[in-house]
Amino acid sequence: IVDALHLIPLKVSAFLDLSRRRTAGETIDSNKINKHFRDVFRLYAMLIPSEKKDVFPLSIKSDMQQFIEAATALSAHLEDLGINTISQEDILRDLNRIYCSAD
């Protein structure tokens, strides 16, 4: 079973892959791209604070940095996901800390 901490990078990778393929001209349903994007935020809400410590490979750090950059221009509509105690900006900052920090 994959927990939220380790599923988030898979969703990020799927979002980036589908976004790149769509940009390259492939017909990709935007709903599929949006689903992976929003899933990252859904899964973030499921993280347990004690789970937030791990060492991730450079490929995951790179993907997460690209995701965070792309996500700053998009809205996850957190209220529709039942997330109303934290902002998207704070979630992105926390994702950066979790997946990209050198700790």
Map each language-model feature to its residues.
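Long, low-complexity C-terminal extensions of enzymes
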Residues: 65-103
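Catalytic cores of NTP-dependent nucleotidyl/adenyl transfer enzymes across multiple folds
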Residues: 1-73
